[in-house]
């Protein structure tokens, strides 16, 4: 590993966290280039609420403010905390709803809690066909990226890019890593520390009470995708690195 780092003219990594990791091993910063794994910016787009068929299919109220989680409903996603927040918001902010899209090992327990606590502000939806992915990520006014503490320190979940591609702000309750820097640096969401229930609840309320900010963050998220995550941007960065290395020989 060290031999490779020492003799390479340039090293391409897929995230700022990977860059920090190899810099800690003594690799000079000017030797490292970050090129994100690209996404298909046309696979997930914003579907206006009045044209989103899933609102009709699952009897969702188009006048409400929704936060949405789409993905694995498992043991590490901190669903208990999320449902506690929704229990509190049901009393204080009845116009805020949660849409849960997905399957997983903890889904039955989630359904039991929703029924036990009469969480009428929570709607559970099964995974949808891939061709409806834009409809799915356009259900919420904001998209959720959540985990229990200690689970996500070294990763940015891929659903982050889908949320941003749909022009939705990201509400992250996650371990501190590159995701925090992306959301803050590009003003495309709100980051709270994994497990901090009150901070997370306040982030939901903040976007609910400021729809202009919510839309701004969503627009900025889409811009980040277009500026950094398209195939065209990614491949051009590879070409630029190759040209630089070859030109120096």
What is each residue range found by the language model?
Residues 61-77, 83-86, 99:
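Conserved donor-binding/catalytic core segment of Leloir-type glycosyltransferases
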């Amino acid at each position: 590993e060290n031999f490779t780092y020492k003799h390479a003219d340039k090293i391409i990594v897929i995230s700022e966290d990977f860059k920090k990791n190899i810099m800690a091993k003594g690799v000079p910063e000017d030797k490292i280039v970050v090129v994100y794994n690209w996404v298909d910016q046309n696979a997930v787009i914003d579907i206006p609420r009045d044209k989103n068929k899933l609102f009709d299919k699952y009897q969702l109220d188009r006048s409400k403010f929704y936060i949405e989680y789409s993905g694995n409903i498992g043991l590490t996603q901190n669903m208990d905390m999320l449902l506690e927040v929704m229990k509190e918001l049901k009393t204080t902010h009845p116009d805020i709803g949660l849409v849960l899209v997905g399957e997983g090992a903890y889904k039955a327990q989630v359904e039991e809690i929703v029924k036990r606590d009469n969480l009428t502000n929570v709607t559970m939806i099964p995974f949808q066909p891939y061709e409806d992915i834009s409809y799915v990520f356009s259900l919420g006014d904001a998209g959720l990226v959540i985990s229990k503490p200690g689970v996500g320190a070294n990763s940015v979940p891929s659903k982050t890019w889908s949320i941003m591609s749909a022009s939705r702000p990201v509400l992250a309750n996650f371990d501190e890593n590159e995701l925090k820097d992306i959301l803050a640096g590009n003003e495309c969401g709100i980051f709270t520390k994994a497990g901090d229930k009150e901070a997370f609840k306040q982030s939901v309320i903040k976007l609910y009470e400021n729809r202009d900010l919510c839309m701004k963050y969503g627009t900025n998220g889409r811009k980040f995708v277009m500026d950094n995550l398209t195939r065209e941007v990614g491949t051009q960065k590879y070409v630029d690195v190759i040209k630089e290395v070859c030109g120096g020989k």
